Structure formats: C-alpha cells, structure tokens
Amino acid sequence: DKDGMLRVIRKHRDAVSTIDATLVSEELLSAASAAWDEAVELSARFGVRNSQASVLAPTGTIGLMMDCDTTGVEPDLGLVKVKKLVGGGTMAIVNQTVPRALTTLGYTKKQVDDIIAYIDVEKSILGAPHLKKEHINVFACSMGDNSIHYLGHVRMMGAVQPFISGAISKTVNMPETATVED
C-alpha cells in the first residue's frame, strides 16, 4: 500500500515541526528535519520495502553489551546496577553519564567527584553532598529509591510515538502498591 505508507512517512516528518525548539539543539532539530525530508523524498521515488519505518525494541541487556547506559526510551534501571554473570559471579555497572550530567548542571570537578564517590558507596544519589534538590529528578531511574513515576514512562512513549510507525516495546515500572485503577 504505497499511498498509505507514504502518509505514514509524511506524518513522521510533519511531527518534527511539533518539537519544542527550546528543548533540543538547533543542530539536532535541523538534522531530524532533513532526515525525515529525505525519507519522504526517497520513499516517494523508490517505494518502501518494509511495512514500518521505525520501531523501538527492548534493548536493556544489549545496551549494556554495547557499553551504553541506556537506549531507546528506557530509563536507566539504576545509577548502579549489579548484573549476574552467566558463568557465576556479579559485575557492578555504574552509569557513566552521571559525571557529564553533573558538569552540565554546573557542579565543579570537586563536587562531581564527591557525588560520584557517594554513589559508589551508597548505590544512590539521594543524600549526596552538594546535590541540589531541584536536580534530584534528573537522576531518577526506573527502579530504586529515586524512581521515575510510571506516568513519566507513559509520557515519554507519547513524546516519541509520532515518530514511530511500528510499536514501542517498553517496560513501565510500577510500585508494588499500584492498584488496578492506577
């Protein structure tokens, strides 16, 4: 169904114009716009081989193997994760983007080092020295003592859905106290 697929590709392209330009770098927004313009042009000229232009697959373990802290729309499981190894034993995996995020937020090298040392010992950022209260949610993860509210997962899926022609496969973590109504 060539016409139907072209409508889908155009819909993805048109969704770029709905992105809040204050939340994304001009370079990234321009690249996204150009990529979808090219997708429309090439799809119209050559057709589309697959029935979907884009999907989001569950890639948590694969992401770890690729040395990524997180991939897709999945938040990090925790700032420090302990992975059971197939041959026995465990391996601690620390989120490598925390120092960069702290630096971007304006923390000094000494403050970053102190916060990272705290995370290494406590396995949490809550209570870390120098950490400003308004920055705590920046480091929220899918599980643990600073977890993202389940509606945050839903909102993230809603934000990317206009660019996904297939499915989003994602875990939405909810607390044990969640009810059917939740």
Feature-to-residue mapping (PLM):
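Catalytic alpha/beta core of large soluble enzyme barrels
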Residues: D1-A34, V40-D182
